[in-house]
Amino acid sequence: MSFALEETLESDWVAVRPHVFDEREKHKFVFIVAWNEIEGKFAITCHNRTAQRQRSGSREQAGTPASDGSRGPGSPAARGRSEAAASATAALRSPGPRKSQAWAEGGSPRSARSLKGDPPRGPAGRGPESPLRSPARAKASPLRRSAESRDAIASATPVPPAPPVPPVSSVRVVSASGAVSEEIEVLEMVREDEAPQPLPDSEQPPSAAELESSAEECSWAGLFSFQDLRAVHQQLCSVNSQLEPCLPVFPEEPSGMWTVLFGGAPEMTEQEIDALCYQLQVYLGHGLDTCGWKILSQVLFTETDDPEEYYESLSELRQKGYEEVLQRARRRIQELLDKHKTIESMVELLDLYQMEDEAYSSLAEATTELYQYLLQPFRDMRELAMLRRQQIKISMENDYLGPRRIESLQKEDADWQRKAHMAVLSIQDLTVKYFEITAKAQKAVYDRMRADQKKFGKASWAAAAERMEKLQYAVSKETLQMMRAKEICLEQKKHALKEEMQSLQGGTEAIARLDQLESDYYDLQLQLYEVQFEILKCEELLLTAQLESIKRLISEKRDEVVYYDTYESMEAMLEKEEMAASVHAQREELQKLQQKARQLEARRGRVSAKKAYLRNKKEICIAKHHEKFQQRFQSEDEYRAHHTIQIKRDKLHDEEERKSAWVSQERQRTLDRLRTFKQRYPGQVILKSTRLRVAHSRRKSTASPVPCEEQCHSLPTVLQGQEKTEVGGGGSQLGPSQTAEPQSLVQLEDTSSEQLESTSLPPRAVVSSELPPPQSAPLLTSIDPKPCSVTIDPLPPPLPPTPPPPPPPPPPPPPPLPVAKDNGASTTAETLEKDALRTEGNERSIPKSASAPAAHLFDSSQLVSARKKLRKTVEGLQRRRVSSPMDEVLASLKRGSFHLKKVEQRTLPPFPDEDDSNNILAQIRKGVKLKKVQKEVLRESFTLLPDTDPLTRSIHEALRRIKEASPESEDEEEALPCTDWEN
């Protein structure tokens, strides 16, 4: 029967909660009954004395003063009444003082005139009507006639007098004969109980908020007619029939037209009213003791009736029924297992084993029913989610929807996907719990049987050996299924952690959260390794059990004794077909068993190899985990060390900045003082001519040895100045353009020397080849590349020529350059050779008068070595340029030395197992066009995000470590063949 059909069949049934009317703690309740003359009904008031005492005691402890009147049963404060409660007493027709001494001393509990006199009644016998409506009053009875009568009744709710009135306890039943004596005892006991008692230390008083919320739970009130009280009596008698003779006899009420003519309520004297009030009060007390407060309060005051408090859903009831059946099956198995201690004979033990098998089958059936019922809602949710997602997908593909509708459908699809995922997780958890119950029961039965094996010998135990093998197989199978269910759950958790790691966003706590997730992942991975070890262990136990059973069968087949008819020879026996067939069948059966045993041995060997593989993976995982922790600690230590060093560096930097600021400040002050001094005392400025300054510098250079760097920078300036002088016609004075040219040349020389110094040797040669021909300084500065900055003044007119020294011997001719294989190499070589020739020509074109000062500064060997280095650089550059064999082939093709031979295209035979859809070359031959990829997309794909974002880099590193620690290569291994327990 389906669950939907069960719901429809049981829709008219209700489930009542068990022990719903049990009271957690006993409370003391007091009933006060009085007669309302305005409505002609009984006014019944009930007070919870225990709650009132707790509230008043907590108020005293909280420091809020409470008067005596606040603790009285009829106090307005006790019931949440207003100050107008006193006026409501005028509407009550209370009985006069009783003749008994007890009533004279204590006053009537029902009387409103015990301490306060009633106002005089009018001619009609009715007092003033009070507008008060008690907030603590509940609905009087389910048999109320109309809402208007309830409003009228509420206006005349009785308010009992002040505290001196002793309430009547509802503990005893007062009979008609001994009413007075019993009443005296009850009143005295109540007075003793009403004395203020200190609260025990264990009882903590409620707070003020709880007091306000529970104010309406201390008192209840209502108006009841004779008919209402009879209906209440019928309901109480249906609960307990002992109350049938206890209801007092009420006078007959007129009905129909008589109510219009003679009024609704019968005329009664004060003595009759007092007697009825007293009897009704005693009746209510007896009903409280018999039926309990919950039933009585719900019958009298039904305002706080909550159906959820009494009824429970049918699904919960059905689940409890399944659980009770499961508990009974568990207890049955436990009882049978306990009987093993007293059994001594093998026959009784075999009978007990049969009973255990039946009990376990009933346990498995009860467990299956329970968990099938628990799984059904999650299965329905999964199916509903899948169906809804499929509908959303079809709607998005086929319908013409706007962007907002598409966005809402996508959100709904994500919501249904999440619900389906949660349902799958719940199904997996319930599956694990199911197999835990069955595996635990099987394990208990198997352990008990192993303990029984020690009591009996091998011969007697042979009768139970087959059952023990079956039990071992069943235990291994149940444990294997439980472990595989756990493995699926752990894999789901791992997948969820990995997705959370990949979806982390930037933030202050992102790195810490990533570390926590990685740690959780490692813990889950270790748990997964343990579960996988248990799985392999169970598989090994299954194989071992099968091997043992097969070996036992083989030994039984071999030891089996077969009796044949007598024959003279073996050939004669084999001549008969039946005998030959039986012998061959036995041999074939033995061969099959032996082959199966060998297969099981091979599978067990593979399981052992896989266990070793998992053990190594587990060690790698632990090592990675420790390595991560060590890296974290090391990074923290390095950060601390670097932080201390950085602090020291920052301090030194601050000190240097302060010193430099102080120096610059002092320098500025000095300059300001000099400026003010010059402004205050202006003096005569003397300017020296250029010729005098150059002569002075020459005398200074001849007097003191000049460093090589200054010589290197001064020589080109002098040479260029002399050349300009000769070109200008040997004039005695230079124009502004002529004086500016040497300065520009000096600047060009400085920049070229800096470029040469900042580069390696081959670029230096290239740069030197690009300089103007008249400058030979790059060749000279390449010998000693040190930075130097020399300020050079404009050159004076040329000096008279001096006899030149003998010229240096000419350098040896350079070796012939190899033939360039490409345009770039030949162009570079030709350029460098021309630059070298220009340099030599410029050196030769320098007049002898100009080379006189440089004779004692340079040696010719330096120039020769510079030329050699330049040529070696050019040769090395050409070798690097033509080192590619493809360049040689292209150069030879240009020269026409050989021609290429046309080769026919080879067609490779296709692989037998390869499909054309997987071969990109075959697809291209068929005419499939390739998609053009833009360079920007490639550039974006090759950009490494981990280098730019530290969080992304950390996520990639964590995923890499996780991949190394996880057994992701299991799929590449040879998988175990599917076994019968996996089906």
Swiss-Prot record:
Induction: Accumulates in DNA-damaged cells (at protein level).
Amino acid composition bias (Acidic residues), ranges on this chain: 967-983
Residues carrying Phosphoserine: 108, 114, 704, 883, 969
Compositional bias (Low complexity): 77-94
Biased composition (Polar residues): 50-61, 734-761
Localization of this protein: Nucleus; Cytoplasmic vesicle; Cytoplasm, Cytoskeleton; Endomembrane system
Broad class of the protein's primary localization: nucleus
Database matches in SUPFAM superfamilies: Formin homology 2 domain (FH2 domain)
Result of altering residue 981 to A: Decreases the activation of Arp2/3 without affecting the intrinsic nucleation activity
UniProt xrefs under InterPro entries: JMY/WHAMM (IPR031738), JMY/WHAMM_N (IPR031808), WH2_dom (IPR003124)
Segments of this protein annotated with the region Disordered: 50-167, 723-855, 962-983
Biological process (GO), any one: DNA repair
Composition bias, Pro residues: 158-167, 794-818
Biased composition (Basic and acidic residues): 831-846
Superkingdom, natural source: Eukaryota
Residues covered by the WH2 domain: 916-933
Protein's membrane topology: Lipid-anchor
Region (Interaction with p300/EP300): 1-119, 469-558
Coiled coil, from the record: 315-351, 480-528, 571-612
Domain notes: The N-terminal region is involved in actin binding and actin nucleation activity.
Entry's family note: Belongs to the JMY family.
The protein, known as: Junction-mediating and -regulatory protein
